[in-house]
Swiss-Prot record:
Gene3D superfamilies: 1.10.287.1480. Binds 16S rRNA, required for the assembly of 30S particles and may also be responsible for determining the conformation of the 16S rRNA at the A site. One of its GO terms (biological process) is translation. GO terms for cellular component: cytoplasm; small ribosomal subunit. The keyword Magnesium does not apply. One of its GO terms (molecular function) is rRNA binding. Its cofactor is Zn(2+). This is Small ribosomal subunit protein uS14. Zn(2+) binds at residues 63, 66, 79, 82.
Length: 100
């Protein structure tokens, strides 16, 4: 289980990403579409002043059950370990154990 502080940090990042998503996209579009050097520089400065944690790259999807940051399936919001446990118990329908 991940520490509560890590889970809270990720939830805070998720809120910041959603809050600044539109503003960040507008500035990026302005930078890409503009031909004026001055406008580009001003837009880049505004983009740099946005909170660092509002960048979507910094947001990590975590397992809803244990908080593990790696190997999380988006469809279930569970890591591979918890997903297997839930499949074996029968909480997720349609799963079957592989054999080859």
């Amino acid at each position: 289980m991940a520490k509560k502080s890590m889970l809270m940090r990720e939830s805070k990042r998720a809120k910041l990403v959603e809050k600044y998503r539109q503003r960040r996209n507008e500035l990026k579009q302005l930078i890409k579409s503009s031909d004026d050097f001055q406008v580009i520089m001003e837009s880049q400065a505004k983009l740099a002043k946005l909170p660092v944690n509002s960048n979507p790259v910094r947001y990590v999807t975590r397992c809803k059950q244990c908080g593990r940051p790696h190997a999380v399936y988006r469809k279930f919001n569970l890591c591979r370990i918890c997903l297997r446990q839930q499949l074996m118990v029968g909480n997720i329908p349609g799963g079957r154990k592989s054999s080859w």
